[in-house]
Amino acid sequence: MTGKLIRMNRILETDGKTVIVAMDHGQFQGPIEGIKNIRKTLENIVAGEPDAVILNPGVIEKNADILGGKVSILCRITGASTNYSAMFDYHRITTTVEHAASIGSDGVVVMGFIGGNGENSSLEIIGRIGEECSKRGMPLITEMLPQAMETTSPTPSISLSEPGSPMNSELIF
């Protein structure tokens, strides 16, 4: 638990206000309008002093010199089909917790889907990643997306972040 606590303290501000910038969209969305040079964009983001950034492993590795010691790094370890695919594919594991730790990550981010076709497999992935995170002292952050649900209630997502949840998530978006 010591590793998780140390890493969580780097991610979360003590004043209760935390800014996390997501920059992991390129893996599935391709080039994003307004972001022509990811390195320059990251330099600008880091200069703004957010608490953490969410990045894909390759971006972390290529930009370690501008990230290290300046911002908490959250590594996206699941991914889906790209926007170029004819059919959406639910997230799969694309790298390991061990690899994320080896490149300096303070936490890992996984996507979860509830209320639709991707629910069972995504919850299984979150559970397996949660176990690995517990073994390695790595915080798990889950992004939960409701699918095919007729409610806008946050209750299904919130229930997965309850203390004692089998998902072991430290944060949920």
What are these regions (language model features)?
Residues 1-13:
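N-terminal basic/disordered segments at the start of proteins
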Residues 13-14, 18-82, 87-173:
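Alpha/beta enzyme core
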